[in-house]
């Protein structure tokens, strides 16, 4: 009991040997992989020890009454999980910028009948202009989008763009150009069934490897990136509750910030950063351009959003 009370006591982050938070988490005191904070930034505790984790199993894992229903600020994805916010960012959420939801759906594993996660794709509000700058560019329009000769008066540029984004050969080219522009994106993965941190890590790695472009990349760089991914999960063990959130922020350089939100405890865990840009680029290209994406529904909505922004 003395150990548990010591772990849960409120304390200043500098007193437990943690470095100052990065500038873009100005009012959150935490260290990647080593601390948890609530979203208000009012409490800092070390990562749960095995003793503290053991207490979880003595409690009911999740109460359905905690599921937040959709309102004017959110949209429903699945009845088993809370509605997804239309906008996410500081000060309520310790992300690098403000994000807006552009696509959501259910992510299935193994079988179309097995619902694993709710998936949301967000775009940085400040970067929405990049969609039209890239996808309306003269080069991409002439080479991949508005390619009918002679041009069809019945099809607008937006019609042609939608067709190109649904074309298995053209979509990866267009999406990769968009990712190369420095657009910031974020994925929100919310378990519909309780899982584990290992499943989150393995699922992320598998999504990267499902991108056909991964087969032609430098293997050493890929392995280095996967090691960084593994390191982000090194200090978190055990089960992941239904309706918790796993976030992946794609930065301008295609590095990724990984974080986790434990809804029942209102605690936000900064897992770390995957600096190797190949991992981030391959992952989000798989989300947005794959023939067999993790969530076809989410990809369809993202395509609709990209067309409307062009």
From Swiss-Prot:
Q: Name one GO molecular function term.
A: intramolecular lyase activity
Q: Which Gene3D superfamilies match?
A: 3.50.70.10
Any Pfam family hit: Chalcone_2
Q: Does the keyword Transferase apply?
A: no
Keyword Transit peptide applies: yes
Q: Where in the cell is it found?
A: Mitochondrion
SUPFAM superfamilies from the entry?
A: Chalcone isomerase
Quote a single Gene Ontology cellular component term: mitochondrion
Domain of life, per UniProt, equals Eukaryota
Which UniProt keywords are listed?
Mitochondrion, Transit peptide
Q: Record's InterPro entries?
A: Chalcone_isomerase (IPR016087), Chalcone_isomerase_3-sand (IPR016088), Chalcone_isomerase_sf (IPR036298)
Return the transit peptide range from the UniProt record: 1-20
Would you identify the family this protein belongs to, as annotated? Belongs to the AIM18/AIM46 family.
Name of the protein this chain belongs to: Altered inheritance of mitochondria protein 46, mitochondrial
The organism of origin for this protein: Saccharomyces cerevisiae (strain YJM789) (Baker's yeast)
